[in-house]
Amino acid sequence: MSEPIRVLQVVTYMGRGGLETMLMNYYRNIDRDKVQFDFLTHRDERWDYDDEIESLGGKIYHLPKLNPFSKNYLNALDKFFKEHKEYQIVHCHQDCLSGVVLKVATKNGVRFTIAHSH
């Protein structure tokens, strides 16, 4: 059997808000043999859904707080995508700041990007 497609979900953190709960409902009900969600968060601490994500086979990565004007943030984001070429689909839930993340993802070879404002 082939490896599942890994979709990177970009969020602030995985607390119990509406966006996070919606993503978890999708994640619980998709065929994880075909599609697997991983999460790029913008907080260091662990949140409500982290244990469940890991139990379902997802990975959680942490970056500094999203700041499009910070050279440190942009460098960390660029480094992440250079080191994680396994992602060809990035689904970003950062409202108007999704463009910052998706531009860096595209620059690093991500083929499919989705900007989703909730």
What are these regions (language model features)?
Residues 92-98, 117:
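Short His-centered aromatic/hydrophobic patch
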Residues 56-59, 64-89, 99-107:
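An amphipathic, basic-hydrophobic alpha-helix
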Residues 70, 94, 111-112:
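Alpha-helix initiation/capping motif
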Residues 2, 29-32, 82, 105:
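Structural motif
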Residues 7, 89, 105-118:
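Active-site proximal beta-strand in glycosyltransferases
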Residues 38, 61, 91, 114-115:
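Structural detector of well-ordered beta-strand residues that form the stable sheet scaffold
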Residues 4-5, 9-72:
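N-terminal strand-loop element at the rim of the active site
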Residues 31-35, 85-86, 107-110:
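Short helix-capping segments at alpha-helix termini
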